[in-house]
C-alpha cells in the first residue's frame, strides 16, 4: 500500500490557476491561440471557398483582406466597392459582403511588389543633392532635362559627386553601389 495514492497529479494549467500568477495563467491560455498568420489565411480561404466561419474570436483586418484579394482581377470590383463604402461596416458585415461578392475559386500567387529602377533613383538623388531640391522637383528636373536632351551633359558634370559616401546614402546594398559607380563612370 502506498501512502501517496490520494495525491492527484495536477497538470500545468491547474498549477498555474492555483498559483494565482497572471503571467503563468496567460502563458497557459496562449497555448490555445493560433498564430495570426494562420488566422489570416483561414479567413482568406473561407472567403475564396465560401466556407462559413465565425469572425468574433478572430483578429480580422479589413485592410489585409482587401489587399490580399485585390491581387486578383476577378476580385477587384468587390474590393473597390469595399474601399469606397466598407470602412463603416463591422468586421462581420465586411466578411459577409466579401463572402457574397467574391467569386468562388482557389487563389494562390505571390503578391505584387513595387520594383524601383535603381539607376533612375541614382540620377534623382544626384539632382537632389546638386540643386538642393526635394524628390518631386528632382523628378521634374530629370523629365525636363531629358526632354531638352541635356541630361547626359548634366550627368557628365555631376559624376564627380558620385562618391562612396553619396552611394551609401542612395543604397545600402554593396552590389548596387558597385553598379552605380560603374554607371557613373560611363557618363
Curated annotation (Swiss-Prot):
Gene Ontology terms for molecular function: DNA binding; DNA clamp loader activity
UniProt KW DNA-binding keyword: yes
Metal-binding among keywords: no
Keyword terms, alphabetized: DNA replication, DNA-binding, Viral DNA replication
Superkingdom of source: Viruses
GO biological process: DNA replication; viral DNA genome replication
Listed Pfam families: Phage_clamp_A
Family of the protein in this entry: Belongs to the Tevenvirinae sliding-clamp-loader small subunit family.
Free-text function comment from the UniProt entry: Forms the sliding-clamp-loader together with the small subunit. The clamp loader holds the clamp in an open conformation and places it onto the DNA.
Record text on subunit structure and interactions: The sliding-clamp-loader consists of 4 large subunits and 1 small subunit. Interacts with the sliding clamp; this interaction allows the sliding-clamp-loader to open the sliding clamp. Part of the replicase complex that includes the DNA polymerase, the polymerase clamp, the clamp loader complex, the single-stranded DNA binding protein, the primase, the helicase and the helicase assembly factor.
Entries under HAMAP family matching the protein: T4_Clamp_Loader_S
Designated name of the protein: Sliding-clamp-loader small subunit
Organism phylogeny: Viruses, Duplodnaviria, Heunggongvirae, Uroviricota, Caudoviricetes
Amino acid at each position: 500500500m502506498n501512502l501517496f495514492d490520494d495525491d492527484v497529479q495536477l497538470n500545468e494549467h491547474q498549477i498555474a490557476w492555483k498559483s494565482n500568477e497572471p503571467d503563468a495563467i496567460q502563458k497557459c491560455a496562449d497555448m490555445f491561440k493560433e498564430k495570426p498568420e494562420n488566422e489570416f489565411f483561414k479567413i482568406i480561404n473561407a472567403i475564396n471557398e465560401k466556407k462559413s466561419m465565425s469572425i468574433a474570436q478572430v483578429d480580422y483586418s479589413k485592410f489585409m483582406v482587401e489587399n490580399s484579394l485585390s491581387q486578383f482581377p476577378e476580385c477587384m470590383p468587390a474590393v473597390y466597392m469595399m474601399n469606397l463604402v466598407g470602412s463603416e461596416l463591422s468586421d462581420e458585415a465586411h466578411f459577409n459582403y466579401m463572402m457574397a461578392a467574391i467569386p468562388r475559386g482557389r487563389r494562390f500567387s505571390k503578391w505584387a511588389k513595387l520594383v524601383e529602377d535603381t539607376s533612375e533613383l541614382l540620377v534623382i538623388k544626384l539632382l537632389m543633392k546638386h540643386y538642393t531640391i526635394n524628390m518631386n522637383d528632382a523628378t521634374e528636373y530629370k523629365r525636363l532635362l531629358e526632354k531638352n536632351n541635356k541630361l547626359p551633359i548634366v550627368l557628365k558634370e555631376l559624376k564627380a559627386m558620385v562618391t562612396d559616401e553619396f552611394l551609401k546614402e542612395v543604397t545600402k546594398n554593396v552590389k548596387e553601389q558597385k553598379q552605380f559607380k560603374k554607371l557613373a563612370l560611363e557618363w
